[in-house]
A protein has these predicted regions:
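Extended, highly charged alpha-helical segments
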Residues: 62-138, 142
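Nucleotide-state sensing region of NTPase/ATPase domains
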Residues: 1-74, 79-86, 90, 152-157, ...
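Conserved NTPase motor "head" modules and their coupling/switch loops across ABC/AAA+ ATPases, GTPases
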Residues: 10-14, 115-227
């Protein structure tokens, strides 16, 4: 049920459930603080991350067509956004991974140009960063795989119904490493990364592949099939 308050332009949504109900109000309170503001049961959380998973919603817009033919980054963002809603701890782990990755890339850039620290010191620091990157990356990839096990059968069944079985859809997680293998991969490519001056492996370089009759949809899917 949606209600519109024309005077205050404040839509409200109410979804009944047993034995209680949840009401969400979107608008501009009279005493709102400057900038972004959110509250749950009248109490504002100390951090925005605490709201993850509080307001699950399914939104479709034309930009979502890029999930099929766009860059892998968009598909990774799709996965990570869904997982932040499902698992409250995912966002914190993801942020830690990104922070360590940024530190690693900064170190690798300096290594490639010969700036700052001695080479041996850079190698030691790189090993420390890779250890943390592997720990966070393994946990995040596991969550991604678990989510796809739930999503793929439903998505493929829905597509089969829409296409009347004209073609078969499948979803595959294109991983750079098997579960438990990220630490070894980082060690194997450490020298290559030092020469390249950038990170070359990790979950930030993986992809979600959508296939139609075992062919990549990003190459062969029509506009209608993408929708």
């Amino acid at each position: 049920v949606l209600e519109a308050d024309t005077q205050r332009d404040r839509p409200e949504g109410c979804e009944p459930a047993e034995p209680a109900h949840i009401r969400m109000t979107v608008g501009t309170p009279e005493a709102a603080k400057p900038g972004r503001y959110a509250a749950v049961n009248g109490a504002a959380p100390k951090r925005a991350a605490a709201l993850a998973g509080s307001f699950p919603a399914v939104v479709f817009d034309p930009g979502h067509l890029s999930l099929v033919k766009g860059a892998p980054e968009g598909r990774r963002k799709f996965l990570d956004a869904a997982l932040c809603q499902l698992y409250p701890g995912y966002l914190a782990s993801y942020r830690r991974y990104v922070r360590v990755l940024q530190q690693k890339n900064a170190l690798l850039r300096h290594s490639a140009t010969g700036q700052e620290r001695p080479y041996a010191e850079k190698r030691t620091l790189l090993e420390v960063l890779n250890t943390e990157l592997a720990a966070q990356g393994e946990a995040l990839q596991q969550r991604r795989r678990e989510y796809l096990k739930l999503l793929a059968p439903r998505a493929c069944a829905n597509y089969a119904e829409l296409s009347h079985g004209a073609e078969r859809m499948s979803i595959r997680y294109a991983a750079q490493f098997a579960p438990g293998g990220l630490a070894d991969l980082l060690r194997q490519r450490q020298e290559e990364e030092l020469r390249a001056g950038q990170s070359l492996c990790g979950i930030h370089r993986e992809d979600l592949e959508l296939l139609l009759d075992d062919q990549p949809a990003r190459v062969y899917a029509s506009q209608g099939q993408q929708r």
